[in-house]
């Protein structure tokens, strides 16, 4: 890190935090804090994207592409369909009821226990995910500054809490517009830099050709196997379910589009996300592909996390084993480089050998990673998550390093602020306010802010354990998939099956959640199918249970919140 990098990083982060605090300095009521103000569609769309695009996205996805290629893009194939369905069928209901949280709808449709069960599932899943979102930039700052994870977690966490507590939903939205612009510019700049750094004559077409020979360009895998993690069908079906659950029932996203100036603005914001999100994720994956191709001409390291590798080498015999693997990697790289050069000169027969050598390199790196996991102290960052950061620090010019680090910090602030804002709002609205129905507006505002601070402490505490996970982007998605299916099932029963009442869906949700956890612990089913299984189980069990228990006393009518536009 040079002086210019520090200047870019510090100026960017301080400007965003200051902007959020200043723009929302007049927030004085609970309604303004929880609901926000009338946002236009581009603010809503960018805020939705920024909420999902955490620092984990920018750290892990290039590493995911480096290791496994473009297949991860299939995870997002169901997203555009989900946006259309939510914009036309779910959003109007939320706005008509003038809800602060999605879970208030469940009390109007079922009863309070169903509302609070679903809200509790959200609090658990999003509270843990917020910790993961904090850990990712802590990984960056630890690598650059050498600070302990606890200090870096605290630094980023406190910054996110500062402007979220200050301005609530509006502060999150106005800062995310800037953050998303910085993220997109940074990743586009990274891709163009790596593309320019390739040998003369390679270019975009040559990059795609080499990546294809390495087996990295399979963006669509039409497999029907349930144990294959990313396929066309798991993306379209499982991805649709997870997107419906995430954007339709996760308060961190629902809160983004409930703040629209009108139904039309909120609806257009969702459709904006449908158009832009998949290309953005493709760009981030292509950064990883570009790094792969770059390292067909310049030897890559055996291990990307040099800190963990250095610690593992202290164990008896490990240094010799890693040195032997490194020597074999040099031989594999030399042979593969020769094959790639032949391919670029028109020799198509080199492709099988290139692919075989790529698999050999992955095997060598896998052996080395296993050695490190067994011998390094616990709590190290995974090797895959270190790929992009290590490449940036080694190869990017001054200024661009600072911009890319700012991208990662901005993404962390954005995702963490959205999560804390939603966690605080859900705790206050769905749990505290029913206990204090006569609370004044000032008391409600104070409670929401205190809950936000409390969840910030929880997230920072959990972040200390995130480094035990193998790949952060997959950990976040698996965590969400465990809870999202049952949550979506409850909402779908509410919207589609009008005869089913609260007790039946409440018991069905508990049983389905237990089944999904058992599936996660005891099977090899790809995690995207957890969403489908959980949702279908809730619906099926609720139908059966309602037939058994029969009609029950209807829930009391839900009183819409004041101040919202229908």
Each model region followed by its residue ranges:
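Membrane-embedded helix-loop-helix hairpins and adjacent transmembrane boundary segments
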Residues: 1-566
């Amino acid at each position: 890190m040079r002086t210019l990098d520090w200047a870019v990083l510090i100026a960017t982060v301080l400007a965003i935090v200051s902007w959020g605090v200043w723009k929302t300095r007049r927030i004085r009521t609970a309604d303004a804090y929880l609901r926000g103000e009338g946002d236009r569609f581009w603010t809503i769309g960018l805020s939705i994207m920024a909420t999902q695009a955490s620092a984990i996205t920018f750290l892990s996805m290039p590493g995911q592409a480096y290791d496994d290629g473009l297949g991860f893009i299939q995870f997002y194939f169901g997203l555009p369909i989900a946006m259309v369905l939510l914009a036309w069928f779910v959003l109007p209901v939320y706005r008509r009821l003038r809800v602060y949280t999605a879970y208030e709808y469940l009390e109007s449709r079922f009863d309070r226990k169903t509302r609070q069960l679903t809200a509790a599932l959200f609090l658990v899943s999003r509270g843990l995910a917020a910790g993961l979102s904090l850990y990712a930039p802590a990984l960056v700052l630890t690598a650059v500054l050498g600070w302990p994870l606890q200090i870096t977690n605290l630094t980023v966490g406190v910054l996110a809490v500062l402007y979220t507590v200050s301005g609530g939903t509006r502060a999150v939205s106005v800062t995310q517009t800037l953050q998303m612009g910085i993220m997109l510019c940074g990743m586009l700049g990274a891709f163009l830099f790596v593309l320019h750094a390739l040998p003369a004559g390679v270019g975009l077409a040559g990059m795609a050709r080499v990546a294809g020979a390495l087996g990295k360009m399979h963006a669509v895998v039409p497999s029907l196997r349930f144990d294959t993690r990313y396929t066309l069908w798991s993306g379209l079906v499982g991805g649709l379910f997870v997107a419906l659950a995430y954007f339709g029932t996760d308060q961190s996203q629902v809160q983004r589009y409930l703040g629209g100036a009108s139904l039309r603005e909120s609806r257009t914001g969702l459709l904006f996300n449908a158009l832009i999100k998949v290309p953005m994720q493709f760009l981030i994956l292509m950064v990883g592909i570009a790094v792969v191709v770059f390292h067909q001409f310049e030897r890559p390291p055996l291990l990307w996390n040099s800190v963990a590798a250095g610690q593992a080498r202290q164990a008896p015999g490990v240094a010799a084993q890693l040195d032997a693997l490194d020597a074999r990697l040099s031989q594999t790289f030399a042979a593969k480089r020769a094959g790639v050069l032949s391919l670029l000169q028109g020799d198509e027969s080199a492709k099988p050998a290139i692919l075989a050598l790529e698999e050999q390199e992955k095997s060598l790196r896998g052996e080395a990673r296993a050695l490190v996991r067994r011998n390094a102290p616990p709590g190290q960052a995974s090797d895959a998550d270190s790929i992009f950061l290590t490449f940036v620090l080694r190869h990017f010019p001054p200024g661009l390093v600072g911009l890319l680090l700012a991208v990662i910090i901005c993404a962390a602030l954005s995702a963490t602020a959205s999560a804390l804002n939603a966690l605080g709002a859900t705790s206050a609205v769905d749990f505290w306010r029913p206990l204090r129905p006569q609370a004044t507006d000032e008391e409600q505002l104070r409670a929401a802010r205190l809950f936000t601070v409390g969840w910030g402490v929880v997230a920072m505490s959990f972040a200390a354990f995130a480094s035990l996970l193998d790949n952060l982007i997959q950990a976040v998605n698996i965590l969400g998939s465990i809870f999202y299916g049952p949550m979506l099932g409850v909402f779908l029963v509410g919207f589609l099956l009008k005869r089913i009442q609260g007790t039946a869906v409440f018991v069905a949700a508990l049983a389905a959640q237990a089944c999904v956890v058992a599936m996660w612990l005891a099977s090899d089913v790809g995690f995207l199918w957890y969403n489908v299984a959980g949702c279908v189980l809730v619906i099926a069990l609720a139908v059966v249970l309602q037939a058994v228990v029969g009609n029950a006393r209807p829930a009391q009518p839900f009183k819409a919140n004041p101040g919202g536009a229908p």
